[in-house]
Each structure stands twice: as C-alpha cells, then as structure tokens.
C-alpha cells in the first residue's frame, strides 16, 4: 500500500441548495462528493472527464491508465451488479468477479485545507478494506442489498498507516 498527499488545485463551487449533488466544476453538471473526489484524482493526473451520473457501475476502471478504481466515503460497492443477491457476501463476490481494476484508491479530502490523501491498495488489500469498512443496507430502490463504505475515520486512517508500514 502507498499513500499519496497533495493539495487540490481543481476549482469547484458548492451549492447547498441543490437537491442531491452539491458540487460543480467549471459550471458543468452537478456532482456528488464521490464524483467530485474522483474528478480531483483525475485532474491531479492531467485527466479531465465529464462524470456521467447515469452509469451506476461498469467493469472498467475510473482511471484507466492506472487500472484504478476510485472510492470514497459513502460510496456503493458495485451498485447494480450481483443482481438481487441474497447475501452481502454474494454481492461482494460478484463485484470482485466482475471488476477489472487491479489498483483501488480510497480518496479523502479535508475541505478546509484542500489537502487530498489517496490510499493506493492492491486487490488483496482492498478485499480486507471492504471486509472492515463497509456496511450492508438496502439500496435506494429497496429491491437489493447495497454495500456502502463507511465515513472516513481516525480508525480507518490508523488501519491505512499500519498497512503502509507492513
């Protein structure tokens, strides 16, 4: 595992009155926080791509050049795959069976300082991360299970630090 820190330079605005997605980049479409963080990670790498909110999940990587999937607080793990799996384990198994990414990036940003921290994990590390820091809930349509990542916490940071030193 590696940890990368940088200061965000991508300009965005925050609109607390917008229904769901509160962030806008260059007066483009609204993004939720996860989409904003993915955009920041791409921008840091010199990539600018418009987010398509109509794509729930695809087998490709968020950052193709690194074969990397980007995740952050509150994200769903593979929403729309695994169908109506009876258990969370089946849903997680379907995700790992279908995802093509070999690197997984957990991204967190302090909005006051704009400091961004990326935690880069391989597949085995990410599987452990998923087992420790996700919760099971009903999806928004209440027809299937949703695997959601918990909020970024000090406990999570301690886990990342311990993994980075091993």
Predicted regions and their residues:
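Nucleic-acid endonuclease domains
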Residues: 1-166
